[in-house]
From Swiss-Prot:
It comes from Syntrophomonas wolfei subsp. wolfei (strain DSM 2245B / Goettingen). The gene is cheD. It is an enzyme of class 3 (hydrolase). SUPFAM superfamilies: CNF1/YfiH-like putative cysteine hydrolases (SSF64438). GO terms for molecular function: protein-glutamine glutaminase activity. Belongs to the CheD family. This is Probable chemoreceptor glutamine deamidase CheD. Keywords: Chemotaxis, Hydrolase. Pfam families: CheD. One of its GO terms (biological process) is chemotaxis. It catalyses: L-glutaminyl-[protein] + H2O = L-glutamyl-[protein] + NH4(+).
């Protein structure tokens, strides 16, 4: 019997097939799904911010793109994954609110998306697909069995990436 494992904001969880991982309420946040298809191990990290370098308190590694990805790689390797086999899919990074002036500092979703992609490249993890941007939230369900990432939205349908 498979179960669905809930991943909260600034949280990280792993699952092996047939279990699935879900996170709801991705606005400017990004869900980073990594998986090793050989052992059917997957992880989901729900990051909120692009970098831990400016944070006063960076103790929660899952909160940031840079440390969240390192956490996921480290924990997956402890559970038998090989970093060289890891593949990624991401979703989120929306611009949920319109701000006057539109300074880059307020474009958290876009900054998160860029930071996640840069960190994936840094760790030589191939990004297979992404569903980022826009101005709407997402709920995602990741299946380590198939590598499918189901993206559900309100008003923008559902799709598997």
């Amino acid at each position: 019997m498979s179960k669905i494992i809930q991943v909260g904001m600034a949280d990280f969880k792993m699952a092996t097939a047939p279990d699935k991982l879900i996170t709801a309420g991705l606005g400017s946040c990004i869900g980073i799904c990594l998986y090793d298809k050989v052992i059917k191990l997957g992880s989901l990290t729900h990051i909120m911010l692009p970098s831990s370098s400016q944070a006063k308190n960076a103790s929660n590694e899952a909160k940031f793109a840079d440390t969240g990805l390192k956490l996921a790689i480290r924990e997956m390797e402890k559970n038998g994954a090989q970093a060289s086999r890891l593949l990624a899919k991401i979703a989120g990074g929306a611009q949920m609110f319109k701000f006057s002036g539109e300074s880059d500092i307020m474009k958290i979703g876009e900054r998160n998306s860029v930071a996640v992609k840069e960190n994936l490249q840094l760790h030589r993890i191939k990004l297979l697909s992404s569903d980022t941007g826009g101005n709407y939230g997402r709920t995602i369900i990741f299946d380590p069995e198939t590598g499918d990432l189901l993206v559900k939205t309100i008003g923008h349908g559902e799709r598997i990436i």
